[in-house]
Amino acid sequence: MIEAARRELAQGGLRAMSFRRLGDAVGATSGALAYHLGAKAAILNEVVTRERLRDRRWHDEWLERLDGLERVDRQALAAILEQYLDALVQGEARLTQLIWMDLTLRAPRDAEVATLVAPWLAERRGFWSRLFEGRIEDAAIWAGLAAAYVTDEGFNGLVVGDDPDYRLLRRMAIDRLASRLERDGVGLEPLFSRLVRRMDRRLGLPTGDVAADAMGPGPRREAALAACHVLVDGGAEALTHRAVAERAGLSRSAVGYYFRTAADLFKAAISGVYLIADGRGAPPTLPPGADPTLWRGQTVVRGELAVILAAARDPTLAPYVIDQRRWRGVSYVRLLRSKGYSGLDALDGQTASMIATGQTILSGVDGDDRRDPLVSWLIARHKD
């Protein structure tokens, strides 16, 4: 029964983990399951408890595997990150990663989910601390960088981890991270930018600016922003014409006029993410006491995370994952250059953006926002 709940949660999200679906999976009635198992929250708690144990054992195997490693130098760090990311999306670990991703997306807006996930996050952070302690200088910083990087990259790997072009791009980012943004090896311009353009053509990504059609003021733009808000709050499974209409204060027919199909609505939600990231649209209502700048950044990251999670369950959406990863790197390097790091190149921006995004995801779970210190340390030697 709990295994059935685990697979429903991994493949369809929290909304899919209903008594009806679970009953169909195990041949029992919804009433019988409710009687024997109690509330849905109790089932989720049991699933997460077992998943944490499975994940803890998986990470303990990694510590045992690397027990004889005396020093973590640049080559060792790159090898560890690459092999770890490969293993993270294989076999049973893939289901664990899907569950982890779904819950980290919900945690910032669901205190009960955050309470379940925070101890799990502490264990994952602890893995990197134990791995690096006594083996590398600035071990605490490297542990933070690794935890942030594998969070973002690990989610992307669920979608395109087997793609040769993506794997080469990933290796470039790993080498750049492990070298603290030194320029040598495979990760040199113009190879990086050419490879990105190759992926654009091969994957058939949308041309031009995805958000262009929703830029002008008016109901179309409001509907796109509302779609983004629904995506951020409830994930792709919550994205319906009715939900968007209610959020935007429009009729369902009006939303359907601008975004006819479910695919159109999904693209509109992505457009909304871009609009908010560029400061041309408002995020969902600011919680009391929240920092507006941080809240905007968290909204963008949760929107991106929702897109990745949807693509992990529907491979036809994979091009959007590559597109937003590329777009984010380009935007972030512009931001860093404007702050006095004019020498950073596109790969630097891509690498730093993954640290920033991964750490923002994690801070949404436990409130430990060390994003700026981590990125500042990574790029410090490139200050003008």
Where are the language model's segments positioned?
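Hydrophobic/aromatic-rich alpha-helical bundle segments in the mid-to-C-terminal region
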Residues: 114, 118, 133-196, 212, ...
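Long compositionally biased, domain-poor regions of proteins
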Residues: 106, 225-233, 247, 254-258, ...
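Short, basic, alpha-helical segments at the C-terminal edge of helix-turn-helix-like DNA-binding modules
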Residues: 49-55, 271-277, 283
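Short, amphipathic alpha-helix enriched in basic
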Residues: 1-21, 25-28, 49, 200-202, ...
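Short, structured motif recognition centered on aromatic/hydrophobic residues
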Residues: 8, 55, 97-107, 117, ...
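Helix-turn-helix
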Residues: 10-46, 230-264, 268
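Amphipathic alpha-helical packing segments from all-alpha helical-bundle domains
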Residues: 92-101, 105-134, 297-305, 315-340
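Hydrophobic alpha-helical connector segments
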Residues: 46, 57-95, 146, 279-305
